[in-house]
């Protein structure tokens, strides 16, 4: 180990020692990470680069920064002069570069030390390469950290843990100030390079196997042939990041296109960039097979469609994918799409390929794996797991560091709930002081929610205006609730929000002020339950409700408790069961989360109750008037749940006699539905405003899908898991019941 200090500032002599370590990294195909915290970091960066260039004379370089900040372009240009192959990337656009790799990756952290960017860029580093993060001071003057700061108060718990682990882990070079270096070497003897393993008699073309970089990729090519057999089939590919799963599927799709077995293939993903590697490798595969193809690109250069003589593959957004038809659909980053979406696709298509990351910086796939287990009993399903990384060797020390410092694979202890629950607030300092406790608590959050990111861990540690409440059973955490203080805004803050300015620290007041124009709501003080999670083996035992009950007791001097989450039937039902009412549903789908945001509130003061009545009645009115347009793709059962649990401040008049006669004619089979559509709409609207009839959730969802959303019988059936005939039977019978009730 290099000593922790280097007296006299003779840092160049120490840096010269790294050449041998860099050579060993090339041999073992593993990476180094250098973290430089210094007022003059460029001198140290250049010295490290000098040593690295002795090992790799013409490296590919990726440089991440915020180009719009003072001096950032000057720093970038100073380093760019040294290289021929240099790509500079704006942090804000870095998602576009998923799948890119480089020998040398440099992160400018002078203005922003953001976990998401660190994880994404360091992951771009190839085996034998080095990632360099440089900053003047990791703790101060950083953009993401400012978003966690309120009234000048913020903590440093995330950074303290980051620095501590960086100094302790091997393969990491840590410079602090002008004369301190911490570094413990790694060895090529501890790594295993990826290797291809082509079957002796492959069924998939040898040219495609030759393009593979690992035995796992060869395995995917051969075993994916499962999808070509007769009958309804689901193929699942799971892996950690960097295993080449998207590339493997791209090569396999090129094989299908060359064979002409599937004329129309759809690819969808949370964003286009999640699946761009699939399209790159379709092209590489087709070229290796000497198959002629045509490419259609968007104005900004995205490959949207690839066609051969007998086949075509195109990317479509998730919403449009619901209404597409074809021979095969591929869903990349499937776990991010939500179980409801996946269920719809699996019901609608005979051939489905689900590709997803497990334990990556984009989230945990635990809920997805549970879904896959349930599917096994319903359809023919094959799950292929990929273990070997292709960008670097197995055993790479930097992957180990990233997983541990960002808790990417954190999992809670399996604890059998004994019926006794101790619920306490755990100070953030205690949480970050005890790594086992932190892993267990964060693991519960990660396993319960797919969309986690390294940023979430920094928020948990650094944001001061929050509570972390933990439920223990047998001395082990089984539930976690993260509460953020919101509201109590000044007139100036309310004016700013109402005029379009951001206020990220107050999510619920922000949405209700900006979009519902409930300006005075901002003055009320509230607690937003940012996350509540129960360990997987203990869900469905009432633990979450017990925790919420305790949180309500803790909320002294608070006007409201609320939560905001992606609209999901079971999640919304949980909140309603615990006395929370929906007051807001976003009008635009959050593409990143693949859903609409819902806000629920439990009023703890009379003033809040007035707002809840008003806002929830406006929400009901909006759903009744715009489900055919704004909420056409929303789950009809979810709409029913919202309509049944919101207030009504208006009523419809009596049902006109003409409408009664028309609906009777329809229920008796004398006229088709389209003839009586306006009468049905009037009657269904009246029902949800007055809620006097007792209908099943399936019956009401059928009414919502056909009457309020305007779906065809076929698409209504797909949404509800029913046949077209079953949906129409539900609608006829339900309209008959409503006539009896409201006339």
Swiss-Prot record:
Subcellular location: Cytoplasm
One Gene Ontology CC term in the entry: cytoplasm
Residues reported in the UniProt entry to bind acetyl-CoA: 532-534
Pfam families: GNAT_acetyltr_2 (PF13718), NAT10_TcmA_helicase (PF05127), TmcA_N (PF08351)
Assigned EC number: 2.3.1.193
Top-level taxon of origin: Archaea
Enzyme class: transferase
Residues involved in ATP binding: 217, 391
Reactions listed under catalytic activity: cytidine(34) in elongator tRNA(Met) + acetyl-CoA + ATP + H2O = N(4)-acetylcytidine(34) in elongator tRNA(Met) + ADP + phosphate + CoA + H(+); a cytidine in RNA + acetyl-CoA + ATP + H2O = an N(4)-acetylcytidine in RNA + ADP + phosphate + CoA + H(+); a cytidine in tRNA + acetyl-CoA + ATP + H2O = an N(4)-acetylcytidine in tRNA + ADP + phosphate + CoA + H(+); a cytidine in mRNA + acetyl-CoA + ATP + H2O = an N(4)-acetylcytidine in mRNA + ADP + phosphate + CoA + H(+)
GO biological process, one term: rRNA acetylation involved in maturation of SSU-rRNA
Main location (coarse class): cytoplasm
Keywords in alphabetical order: Acyltransferase, ATP-binding, Cytoplasm, Nucleotide-binding, RNA-binding, rRNA processing, rRNA-binding, Transferase, tRNA processing, tRNA-binding
Domain N-acetyltransferase: 421-605
InterPro entries: Acyl_CoA_acyltransferase, GNAT_dom, NAT10/TcmA_helicase, P-loop_NTPase, TmcA/NAT10/Kre33, TmcA_N, tRNA_acetyltr_TmcA
Record-linked PROSITE patterns: GNAT
Single annotated GO MF: rRNA binding
Record field: transmembrane: none
Family classification: Belongs to the TmcA family.
Functional description taken from the UniProt entry: Catalyzes the formation of N(4)-acetylcytidine (ac(4)C) at the wobble position of tRNA(Met), by using acetyl-CoA as an acetyl donor and ATP (or GTP).
Protein name (database record): tRNA(Met) cytidine acetyltransferase TmcA 1
Organism expressing this protein natively: Saccharolobus solfataricus (strain ATCC 35092 / DSM 1617 / JCM 11322 / P2) (Sulfolobus solfataricus)
